[in-house]
């Protein structure tokens, strides 16, 4: 709790907790070191420290997942005073522990989609408005830094492995701490936010694509080739 007070005194005004689930059995399956009780305590400590802008994460479509589990996790986070919630489906990467040894009871794609739609419905019923595929907020508490990413705005990342986008160009630093500390790590250019990147990112947002903004940014009308690209993205999920 002392750390939370120090963060708040330093000017940090938003904090996020990776709750994921209100069931300890699921947290153990995920390899998370905390318990549901500790998650509740963290929210209470953050409020005592003066945080009013608190976010919580919910992981959907876990093994043997049910609507009841989602409801329990939402209750934990909402009662903790969260103003923002990120709710996202479990994604198993091929080289991860789950990729090598998939757990039993994973939902099918259709079952996972049903869970997601149920989560969206319940979150909005509880006053968390969806503004992006996986993000929901009370009015005025949307994640400002993420909106910058999705709008292809400028952002500066500091430190090893940090990514930045400035003046329409993307760059990042290698994940070599020693090289960074000794000022021998050169930033690596990684292209820019082109029309296709912009389309993909804008389609993550509930507001969708504004054709006038698109024309102002790229100096051209939205064309049939861009429409075909968007349709291809939709067909591929």
Map each language-model feature to its residues.
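C-terminal scaffold of the Radical SAM
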Residues: 1-220
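Mobile late-domain/C-terminal helix-loop "cap" segments
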Residues: 220-227
């Amino acid at each position: 709790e002392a750390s939370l007070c120090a963060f708040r005194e330093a000017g940090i005004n938003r904090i996020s907790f990776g709750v994921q689930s209100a069931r300890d059995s699921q947290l153990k399956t995920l390899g998370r070191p905390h318990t549901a009780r500790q998650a509740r305590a963290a929210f209470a400590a953050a409020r005592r420290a003066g945080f009013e802008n608190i976010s919580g994460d919910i992981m959907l479509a876990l093994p043997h997942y049910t609507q009841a589990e989602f409801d329990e996790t939402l209750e934990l986070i909402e009662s903790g005073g969260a103003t923002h919630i990120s709710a996202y489906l479990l994604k198993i990467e091929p080289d991860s522990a789950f990729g090598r040894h998939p757990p039993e009871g994973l939902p099918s794609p259709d079952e996972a989609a049903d869970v997601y739609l149920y989560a969206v419905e319940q979150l909005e019923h509880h006053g968390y408005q969806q503004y992006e595929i996986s993000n929901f907020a009370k009015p005025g508490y949307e994640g400002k830094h993420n909106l910058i990413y999705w709008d292809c705005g400028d952002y500066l990342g500091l430190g090893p492995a940090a990514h930045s986008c400035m003046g329409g160009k993307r760059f990042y630093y290698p994940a070599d701490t020693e090289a960074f500390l000794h000022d021998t790590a050169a930033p690596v250019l990684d292209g820019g936010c082109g029309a296709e990147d912009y389309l993909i990112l804008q389609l993550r947002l509930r507001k969708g694509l504004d054709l006038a903004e698109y024309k102002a940014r790229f100096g051209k009308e939205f064309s049939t080739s861009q429409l075909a690209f968007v349709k291809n993205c939709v067909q591929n999920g």
